[in-house]
């Protein structure tokens, strides 16, 4: 669920997802278009593509089980959808952590009107 994804992001990056990632670049937050602006934005398009493969799942609201072991998230047992959603979120949160050094505050609230290049495909 988005609530759980927010918790993963906060743990991995020490940043609250809403102000720091909800409107970042061309792909973080709802939807996306154009080319990713940087590594952080690329994490978001990969997450969008991951969710896109789960069209039959309720990706935004389906709760899943996960735990934290030795500083890493581990997805738990559940339905196929729950496990896949958890993996999408886990991989994206870890990607955002790896991208922290290139995070640009100028992309934090980025207007969609600046995302007009041809969109990348999954």
Swiss-Prot record:
InterPro entries: PLipase_A2, PLipase_A2_Asp_AS, PLipase_A2_dom, PLipase_A2_dom_sf, PLipase_A2_His_AS. It catalyses: a 1,2-diacyl-sn-glycero-3-phosphocholine + H2O = a 1-acyl-sn-glycero-3-phosphocholine + a fatty acid + H(+). Its main location: secreted. One of its GO terms (cellular component) is extracellular region. It is found in: Secreted. Expressed by the venom gland. Binds 1 Ca(2+) ion. Gene3D superfamilies: Phospholipase A2 domain. Ca(2+) binds at residues 27, 29, 31, 48. Transmembrane segments: none annotated. Keywords: Calcium, Disulfide bond, Hydrolase, Lipid degradation, Lipid metabolism, Metal-binding, Myotoxin, Neurotoxin, Secreted, Toxin. Its EC number is 3.1.1.4. One of its GO terms (biological process) is lipid catabolic process. The active site is at residues 47, 89. Its cofactor is Ca(2+). Disulfide bonds join 26-115, 28-44, 43-95, 49-122, 50-88, 57-81, 75-86. Belongs to the phospholipase A2 family. Group II subfamily. D49 sub-subfamily. This is Basic phospholipase A2 Cdr-12. It comes from Crotalus durissus ruruima.
């Amino acid at each position: 669920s988005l609530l759980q994804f927010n918790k993963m992001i906060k743990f991995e990056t020490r940043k609250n997802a809403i102000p720091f990632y909800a409107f970042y670049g061309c792909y973080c937050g709802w939807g996306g278009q154009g080319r990713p602006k940087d590594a952080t934005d690329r994490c978001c398009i990969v997450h969008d593509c991951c969710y896109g493969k789960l069209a039959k799942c309720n990706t935004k609201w389906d709760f899943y089980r996960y735990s934290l072991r030795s500083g890493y998230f581990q997805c738990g047992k559940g339905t196929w959808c729950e496990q896949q959603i958890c993996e999408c979120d886990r991989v994206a949160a870890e990607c955002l952590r790896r991208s922290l050094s290139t995070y640009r505050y100028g992309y934090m609230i980025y207007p969609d009107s600046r995302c007009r290049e041809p969109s990348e495909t999954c």
